[in-house]
Curated annotation (Swiss-Prot):
Family to which this protein belongs: Belongs to the helicase family. AddB/RexB type 1 subfamily.
Organism: Moorella thermoacetica (strain ATCC 39073 / JCM 9320)
EC number(s) reported in the record: 3.1.-.-
Protein name as annotated: ATP-dependent helicase/deoxyribonuclease subunit B
Gene Ontology MF terms: 4 iron, 4 sulfur cluster binding; 5'-3' exonuclease activity; ATP binding; double-stranded DNA binding; helicase activity; metal ion binding
Residues annotated for [4Fe-4S] cluster binding in this entry: 788, 1107, 1110, 1116
Domain UvrD-like helicase C-terminal, first and last residues per copy: 282-578
Residues that bind ATP: 8-15
Length: 1151
């Protein structure tokens, strides 16, 4: 029984000494007492590999490489003592939550925090620390008693200790005799070690530790008392072992460990052998003088500069983290290719992995560098975790849209994603949730947008949706049925969840994913899919152990399980032997490195700016220490120990050290280098600091960019994008890519350098198949094409439509208004009422009746689905009431009366279509729906006007008509005039075309306004706007009071009865010219459609563009900055509109 301490600075050969000793013992004979190597858990695999190489034998059974926990498993297996169920960290957190919930009324300071996010985790962390340092509830009581004696029982610290003692004691009572707390594992191990026969006479080497917790120290003390010899290696300058080191000294952590171990051995009556001191220049740096100097003088003051060349050390300042990682990846590739280093001989080290993880993974994948990230893998993103969370949330939130489709899109529900997408569109369009999911009756909703004649349910599409719904929801419905409306225990809820996972075939699906990932070479993903099921089952088992017989509300169960899922992490092992390992300074263990890449050497990162503990402040820790309660080091001491971590990082490799730091973060905020950088410059004056920027290649150092074909092609594409001649080197790269099979796959990137965002016209055959003859078009489709041909192609050629949602959008409101105004006119006809004699009260009553009849048909009773939509219903009715007051005034003051409302013209309409001649063999039927066609007679001759309802004030823009962007009103009037013989039995004259805004305008006035004045102001705001026939008498048929009250139409009369200058009117010939122009422009646009034009060519008029509110921007990716992809600019007309219109028609006639 003896303790031996092996001391040496970094690289002095401590691990090598242990392995050589084991090799020598094995050479004497394979049989004998156990040889045990005790290492940190994350280092066991590496140690086994190093042992295999050092021993030089194919295998051995006498040597065991163990961590503390694995040692415990071996001891308990032989000596017993751990028969109770092992409660893991997650199970303990669940038990702690139950304890806190049961004793919440007894808590003081912690009571208001008990339900806060993260509180249970922090409390579990604190109790774990207490156990780690062998502090019992009785120890806390002892400190509290001192506080009471000194009248300090109401201090914050005393109140914390009181609550901690209460929770700690109750947790111990809860677990006692039932479960084994993971934080008691090492304490129990220390007690059982003497009873383990394989330890007696064993030789133990403890390597890779810089310090031990009191629990680990107790295990080591027990080992010393049983084993033949315990050898502990410490990274400590042997010359410093005879004195206690100050907290700021470099080797303070290991110096304290050295003295503690000697005290433990003496206390146990164990002989302490002479220290093995490994002095002199560490063997690791014999071929690297600069690294040797750095190791020897890093922690010494005053600094001694190195007079030689700083060969093997590079210091790089990078523009940002992405550039930093790319520069490191290029150097790793160079070392592998030119220096013949294997991947495993290089490692990437960071103090904080979080900001670098994704950058390292993505960059190394792009550079084809095999990589293993050394960390416990969080799995909150995994589909299985998402499935479990979503299933519970779906039941809790009564089948709300979000959790239901998160569940379905986990890819663990046996329904194809295409069918889930169809189901999702249907659910969103019809607002389905809650009992409508759980109801066994089929869904029956029409899909028509026509409020008056909705499409019948029960169609083939409806049957398909119901079949998908059944397959998608049947398992979740059974799960819901097992949980809803019942008081259940944790065991019963867990059983229902397990049944759901089994019914879905989750284990089989995960196994298949694992096989697929392995076949594709993604061994990390294969391990993840393989381990996640086991991890979840362990978590559920712990939950049942901790809370199986406890009655839980489902919400509480879900919160507890979610806490466990958040902390669930997988322990992946490197899937291959030859990989670059990336990890944190305090975790990674790679002793035989040839090159170390230390990234992120920034201020506040290395040394790290450590957060203060949430339970005990540094001042409180010092106070407890003075009272005899030893806990984890204070933040100040941990900050001093960061220096030691930095020392280990800088001395990890034999030949090559890369240090880098970013100058800015991802948002461009400036970052500063670590103070270590300044010290490095002082220690190594010959070290030249390099920069890695974001500039494009094209200079003297371009060879560094030729790392992989993919990377070279990417840089080449950026150079081509400059539009300048390529430098000679890159011309060679371009030629190589064209000639090499691998390089040809990268040509798509090269073409990006000369990218032009344009689409070729459709082939004639394809255009004929896409647009059947004769082509039927609506006027809005023509206007869309005039705005941008590609938008027309996507919307009407390919049929891409925005997803319909269960909401009242502007289109739905417009639909409602149109239907209400139509029904109003029809109700007048049914009752035989003259609109001109109708009072506002009578009109309001009819409108109210119309709204009552239409409201249920809008989006499947959406207006009665919530209080918010109930309020919207009132606003819709109020708007219609205001609008009707103005329309009533029109009827009272004019002779025009509705002849037809919401009347369709087209092949299947009430009126015949407009026929267009779009070229030889290209007949086009133009279809549409006119909101209102009004008629009045003068001297026995009928006059027609058309009215188009809009949601906002709109005027007839003749320039927009000329360009084909506003054809509706002229073509509506043309369709009405063409249909006049059918409607009236005789031809009719055009009276005008008008827009009417259906809205409830907000009138701003400084003072109070009377009822009549307010009505007049509303009429002025709701004036009809458009183009009227230049005939005062016809205009008076619309408003006989226009001379006195010009508040209905967009014009005024002079005192002599003539029209004022600038009035929007046109003579009969001009009106006919306008209608002919609109028809000719429509024919031209229709011809372009049939010709297959689909170019991305949005118009721009002033600040208005076709891209405004266009839903297809993500599809076309239009960017006016790309050469050749600018807007099609439409300016003001270069002359008189009527002359230009006549000229256009003349050119069309000649063509």
């Amino acid at each position: 029984m003896a303790l031996r301490l092996v001391l040496g600075r970094a690289g002095s050969g401590k691990t090598r000494l242990c392995l050589e000793e084991i090799k020598a013992i094995l050479a004497e004979g394979p049989a004998g007492p156990a040889l045990i190597i005790l290492t940190p858990e994350q280092a066991t695999l590496q140690m086994e590999l190093d042992l295999h190489r050092a021993a030089g034998v194919p295998g051995f059974s006498r040597v065991q490489v163990l961590s503390f926990r694995r040692l415990g498993w071996r001891v308990f297996q032989e000596a017993g003592g751990a028969a109770r169920p092992h409660l893991g960290e997650m199970g303990k957190a669940m038990a702690l939550r139950a304890v806190v919930s049961a004793h919440r009324d007894d808590l003081g300071l912690f009571a208001p925090l008990a339900g806060s996010p993260g509180f249970i985790e922090q409390l579990a962390h604190t109790i774990a620390e207490l156990k780690l340092y062998r502090v019992t509830p009785a120890d806390l009581d002892r400190i509290l008693e001192r506080y009471r004696e000194t009248g300090r029982e109401q201090t914050i610290l005393a109140r914390k200790l009181r609550d901690l003692a209460l929770v700690y004691r109750e947790l111990e009572t809860y677990l006692a005799g039932r479960y084994l707390d993971p934080d008691d594992y090492l304490t129990l191990l220390a007690g059982r070690l003497p009873e383990a026969a394989f330890i007696r006479g064993a030789r133990v080497w403890v390597d890779g530790f810089n310090g031990f917790t009191p629990q680990e120290e107790a295990v080591l003390q027990a080992l010393m008392a049983v084993a033949e010899q315990v050898t502990v290696t410490l990274c400590l300058d042997p010359t410093l072992r005879h004195r206690r080191l100050g907290e700021t000294e470099l080797f303070h952590p290991t110096g304290e460990t050295y003295h503690r171990l000697r005290q433990l051995a003496l206390a146990a009556g164990v002989r302490v052998e002479d220290d093995v001191c490994l002095a002199g220049t560490p063997p690791r740096f014999r071929e690297a003088p600069a690294l040797a100097h750095l190791e020897a003088h890093f922690g010494r003051w005053p600094l001694r500069p190195f007079r030689g060349d700083a060969a093997g050390i590079r210091l790089v300042a990078a523009a940002n983290r992405r550039v930093e990682v790319e520069a490191a990846a290029r150097e790793i590739l160079r070392l592998a290719r030119e220096e013949n280093l294997s991947w495993r001989q290089m490692a990437v080290l960071v103090r904080d992995l979080e900001p670098y993880h994704d950058l390292i993974v993505n960059t190394f994948r792009d550079f084809n560098i095999p990589l293993f990230i050394d960390r416990r893998r969080p799995v909150g993103h995994h589909p299985l975790v998402e499935l479990v969370r979503a299933a519970l949330e779906a039941v809790l939130e009564d089948w709300a849209y979000d959790p239901v489709f998160r569940y379905l899109k986990s890819d663990l529900v046996p329904v194809p994603r295409e069918e889930i997408d169809l189901l999702e569109n249907y659910v969103l369009a019809h607002g389905i949730r809650g009992r409508r999911w759980r109801d066994s009756r089929p869904w029956q909703y029409g899909n028509s947008r026509d409020l008056e004649t909705p499409s019948p349910p029960g169609s083939a599409a409806g049957e398909t949706i119901n079949a998908i719904r059944e397959r998608a929801s049947c398992h979740l419905r059974r799960f819901d049925g097992a949980l809803r409306g019942r008081q259940l225990t944790g065991r019963e809820i867990t059983a229902a969840l397990f049944d759901l996972l089994q019914e879905l075939g989750v284990p089989e699906r995960l196994a298949a994913w694992s096989r697929q990932a392995a076949a594709a070479g993604d061994l990390d993903a294969a391990q993840e899919h393989e381990q996640i099921w086991e991890g979840l089952m362990d978590l559920l088992e712990e939950l049942v152990l901790a809370l199986g017989d406890t009655s839980l509300e489902l919400e509480e169960y879900a919160a507890i399980l979610d806490t466990g899922l958040e902390s669930l992490k997988l322990r992946l092992i490197p899937p291959a032997l030859d990989q670059v390992v990336a990890g944190t300074l305090d975790r990674s263990r790679q002793p035989e490195l040839q090159a170390a890449f230390v990234l992120g050497v920034g201020e506040g990162v290395l040394p790290a700016r450590l957060p203060e503990d949430a339970t005990f402040s540094d001042r409180e820790r010092e106070e407890l220490r003075a009272a005899g309660l030893e806990l984890a080091p204070t933040g100040t001491l941990r900050l001093f120990h960061e220096e030691f971590l930095a020392y280990l990082a800088l001395t990890r490799s034999r030949r090559y050290l890369w240090l880098s730091y970013p100058l800015a973060d991802a948002e461009g905020k400036a970052l500063s280098p670590s103070p270590l950088v300044r010290r490095l410059r002082q220690l190594l004056p010959g070290l030249r600091e390099e920069t890695a920027g974001t500039e494009l290649p094209g200079g003297d150092d371009d060879l560094v960019y030729l790392t992989t074909p993919r990377q070279a092609a990417g840089h080449l594409a950026r150079l081509l994008g400059r539009g300048r001649p390529l430098p000679p080197l890159w011309q060679e790269v371009y030629r190589w890519l064209h000639q090499d099979a691998r390089g040809q796959k990268m040509l798509g990137l090269l073409e990006g350098g000369g990218y032009r965002n344009q689409v070729d016209p459709l082939e004639p055959e394809l255009a004929r198949g896409l647009y059947p003859r004769p082509l039927r078009l609506s006027i809005s489709q023509l206007e869309t094409f005039a705005g941008c041909p590609f938008r027309y192609f996507l919307s009407y050629g390919l049929g891409l439509q925005e997803r319909r949602l269960y909401q009242v959008d502007p289109a739905g409101m417009g639909q409602f208004y149109h239907a209400a105004l139509k029904l109003f006119v029809e109700e007048l006809g049914r009752r035989g009422l003259d609109w001109g004699r109708l009072s506002d009260n009578e009109a309001a009553a009819i409108i109210s009746q119309v709204v009552d009849s239409l409201a249920p048909a809008l989006q499947h009773e959406i207006l009665s689905s919530s209080a918010r939509y109930g309020y919207l219903r009132k606003k819709l009715e109020q708007t219609l009431q205001r609008v009707m007051e103005v329309l009533n005034e029109h009827a009272r003051r004019g002779e025009f009366r509705p002849l037809a409302v919401e009347t369709s013209f087209g092949c299947r309409g009430k009126l015949p279509p407009l026929q267009l001649d779009a070229g030889p063999g290209r007949r086009v039927f133009l279809e549409g729906r006119v909101d209102r066609i009004d008629v009045a007679r003068r001297q026995g001759r009928p006059y027609l006007r058309v009215i188009d309802y809009k949601s906002s004030p709109t005027t007839l823009d003749l320039t927009a008509v000329y360009y084909g962007l506003a054809l509706q009103l002229p073509l509506y009037l043309r369709a009405a005039l063409d249909a006049a013989p059918e409607l009236l039995g005789e031809a009719a004259e055009p009276a005008g075309m008008l827009y009417f805004a259906v809205r409830n305008p907000l009138i701003r006035q400084r003072g109070p306004v009377g009822k009549e004045a307010a009505a007049r102001l509303r009429r002025q705001e709701l004036k009809m706007r458009g183009l009227l026939l230049d005939d005062v008498e016809v205009i008076k048929l619309m408003d006989r009071e226009i001379a006195a009250s010009p508040d209905l139409l967009p014009l005024r009369l002079n005192k002599d009865g003539s029209l004022r200058k600038g009035a929007p009117v046109a003579g009969r010939e001009e009106m006919a010219l306008l209608l002919d122009l609109a028809l000719a422009r429509a024919a031209e646009l229709a011809g372009a459609i049939l010709s297959g034009r689909v170019e991305i060519s949005p118009y721009r008029r002033g600040q208005e563009t076709a891209c405004d509110f266009c839903p297809y921007r993500p599809v076309c990716a239009f960017d006016p900055q790309i050469p050749g992809s600018g807007y099609r600019r439409l300016g003001n007309l270069p002359g008189d509109f009527w002359q230009l219109a006549a000229a256009f028609l003349g050119s069309q006639m000649k063509g």
